[in-house]
Amino acid sequence: MHTRLISLLVGCAIIAGCSSSSNAPRAVPTSPATNTNGTPPTAIVTARFDPAAGVIPFPNNLLLSGTTDLTLNIPVANPADFSNPQVALNALDGFSPIHPWSTSFSVGITTNGLLASTLNLNTVRVFQVSLTGPGGGVTGVVRELAFGVDFIAALSSVDATGRTLAIVPLRPLAQLTSYMAVLTTGITDVAGNNATPDTTYFLAKRTATLITAPAPTGGCTDPSVSTDPLLPRANACGLEPLRLLTNSHLVAAASRGIPRDDVIVSWVMTTQSISPVLAAVRSTVTPAATTLVPTGLTLQAANAALPPIADIFIGTIAMPYYLDAPTDAGQTPSIVLRTFWQARPGAYIPPFNAFGLSPTSTNLTFANPLPVRRSTQTIPVLLTVPNAASQRTRPAAGWPVVIYQHGITRNRSDALAIAATFASQGYAVIAIDLPLHGITDRANPFNIRNTPFFAAGARERTFDVDLVNN
């Protein structure tokens, strides 16, 4: 179960009064602050970073903190309420490879927002990075993403105040890959005031430990104490792991020429897996026999606008099904809209089976990629084969076959519309329906109810459930 409290961030709750702290043992006189253009600041512009209040750049690997199965761990009120999008996100093993990133700024009341022209290749940097492990610190930079080629940065179109920066991928990011964003002081508001770190990030940038005798992961061990008189022990203990993560960002950024003092905020995100689950399913699927019989109809009999150059066959195939079905014992029709693929509890593959992960988790991830088969469903198949009218000769090895995949909300019979074109070139066309799709018109001769296969247990993939009005 995902916890409400993110333990890594527990120390961030009451540090607002600690911003005067520094690495120096005592305060020393300094020159008046100026912006990089030489003007005195007229407002304080901070890159907002307050994890205790849930204010962090998104997506962010901090939301993996406390995970028990390598999925996201966004704090939610009810982990069982999958109508909450954040609960659904918590079943994923990473973040979207295409969705924009965002981070916010607190702009002074005398200004009108961030200056868009300062969001450029010098102030917004994105790197592909390697980590110590899932959600861990940065160990190195793999490559830098190109501004204007791989991504752009701009003011968010959904924030009229001009306080939100959006980083928009221009091409999909790689799956199961970590990326680090680094923003610098070159970002300004319209008055020329340079952006600065928020209090928590300022403390996390410190090079010196916040506690004496820290644990290897940054937590407190007795009798450790805070190294800063203005920072209570509990807060220092909670911030030390964050300091270690942040410093790993800054070391990596420095390796690419970004001075530590110029960084106003940084964060890392890891993209979700895309192919492991489908690859795991494919590895277990074996060829299945297809039963096909001629209908005695040609394409023209099905649609008068089509030439009669292919014969139509119908049939069935038995397929594994990974969702609950209304035909299962005790299930109601609405079950088709309320279930999703699940893994066998705790069935992690090596090396993750040695990580001490949750033995009860059923989330499908790169660590537990094989879904549980709920049933075997006998589903309809539609096939067209060139006939003599096509003036094509059947090859000795048989007709080459085109697999047709219909679009969302459509069905397998759409294959008939292109079957004539393929038949004229000597191709057979075969089609099945997407899950929860099928022919809903009871008068359609290809509806499985109108064939002998229905009596043998075959069903449309809609299970004859009205998925539109229910």
Predicted regions and their residues:
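Accessory recognition modules or surfaces
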Residues: 150-164, 170-172, 190-206, 378-401, ...
